[in-house]
Amino acid sequence: MNILIIGGGISGISAAKVALGEKHDVTILESTPEPGGLMARIANCRVGFKTFFDEIRDNERLTVIGDAKIIKVDKKDKAFAVTLDNGRALTADRVVVAAGLTPYDPVEYKGKRVLTSLEYDAVIDQRQGELPADFNRIGFFLCVGSRSKDYPLCSSVCCSYTLREVKWTLQRAKPEITVFYNDLRFFGQEFYMEKAFRDTGVKFVRANSR
């Protein structure tokens, strides 16, 4: 069976790994030059993604097409005919859509001293893991873009991601850290991490970030 996977991020690679394990032929279409998706932009995840992708990279049943853009999809009998913007035509028995996500852009909070989590990661990454000297007081605001009138659902990731950012920060420096949250929704050992961070002086303040 020929399986076409749209998206070469962690979801697409995970799907490819399963399909290859079942001896199917797999083609991954990635809109950027290299697979990685959002994880490739997160310094602390990049190595882990590379290791994960390396497990299937040389599989003879796998084809990865970078800078791919789909312009047309037709259903023919039981197969899909896919045309790319460079004129290349592909045929697949199954299509998996793993097109990733678009990070929320908090325009209402924009400012010189306001960073999204991805931007914060990039700052540390560019400095080879060092925290800028003027980052001596840091506030993490949770639920930005969710738990609001327009989007009332919990993102289910920002609490865990913030704990990771706090841990990563404290491994590099000892700034004053305050976490502002609506509700804390952790998983497993993250509850113990929260207590450990509180014990080291990290402040957790219930607040409304909407």
Where do the model's predicted regions map?
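Rossmann-like dinucleotide/flavin-binding elements
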Residues: 1-35, 73, 101-186
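Electropositive phosphate-/nucleotide-binding environments in soluble metabolic enzymes
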Residues: 10-13, 46-50, 67, 89, ...
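Conserved N-terminal glycine-rich FAD pyrophosphate-binding loop of Rossmann-like flavoproteins
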Residues: 33-51
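Surface-exposed beta-strand edges and their flanking turn/coil or helix-capping segments
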Residues: 41, 79, 95, 129-130, ...
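Short secondary-structure boundary/capping segments
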Residues: 42-45, 110-112, 193-196
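A Rossmann-like FAD-binding core segment of flavoenzymes
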Residues: 50-97, 165-210
